[in-house]
Design a protein with these regions (language model features):
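Extracytosolic ligand-binding ectodomains
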Residues: 1-199
């Protein structure tokens, strides 16, 4: 549904709910069917074009690490289609996975993240997560905006602002009440995140 809000419609969607409960053959069969795999072992020069130009995998790290190598095995890896990931993919296990090299990630730009993490750690003796940063920013935003004592409703004030820079990154409130964020585009290359050669 969220892709539709931006005028994008997926040509195919594969749902794999609980792959830990799935038999391996069933798991492989579902991915093979999704990739529209054609066996070219007898004639390697007949590899057809990939079934899709872009792949988005939504799931936790373990899920991604189970699905990506199988997609590559069935000729639908980042060498043949654009793989798009999110900031949750910025983990050593994912960056080191051979079948995810050339994947493009979007990461929020968070210039004050280390400052927030130090303050949070000193106060609570534990690591901060994304939810803590967003909650802090939301609270600060509402307090600051409501202190303006404007006759305009608070929701309208939030929508009309140019944007905010908080610990969770730069964002603007949409009319739907969602946040629109500024992201940086990076690529996994040689087990590291680098700026892609083409932006």
């Amino acid at each position: 549904q969220q892709l539709g809000e931006y005028g994008l419609l997926p040509s195919s969607v594969l749902y794999l709910d609980d792959i830990s409960m799935m038999e391996q053959q069933q798991f492989l069969s579902k991915i093979k069917k999704f990739t529209q795999y054609v066996d070219t072992t007898k004639d390697p020069l007949t590899l057809p074009p990939p079934a899709f130009d872009t792949i988005i995998i939504a799931g936790n790290t373990d899920f991604i690490l189970q699905v990506a190598p199988i997609l590559s095995y069935y000729d639908l890896g980042p060498d043949r289609a654009l793989f798009i990931g999110i900031d949750k993919w910025n983990r050593p296990k994912v960056l080191n996975e051979p079948s995810l090299q050339k994947t493009v990630l979007t990461l929020p730009i968070r210039p004050a993240e280390s400052k927030f993490n130090k303050i949070w750690q000193a106060e609570f003796r534990m690591d901060a997560n994304d939810l803590a940063k967003m909650a802090f920013d939301a609270t600060a935003l509402v307090i600051t905006t409501s202190a303006l004592e404007s006759p305009v409703p608070l929701s309208t004030q939030l929508e009309n602002q140019a944007g905010f820079i908080g610990f969770s990154g730069q964002f603007k409130m949409s009319k739907a009440g969602l946040t629109e964020r500024v992201f940086e585009i990076l690529e996994i290359s040689d087990n590291m995140l680098v700026k892609p050669s083409i932006q």
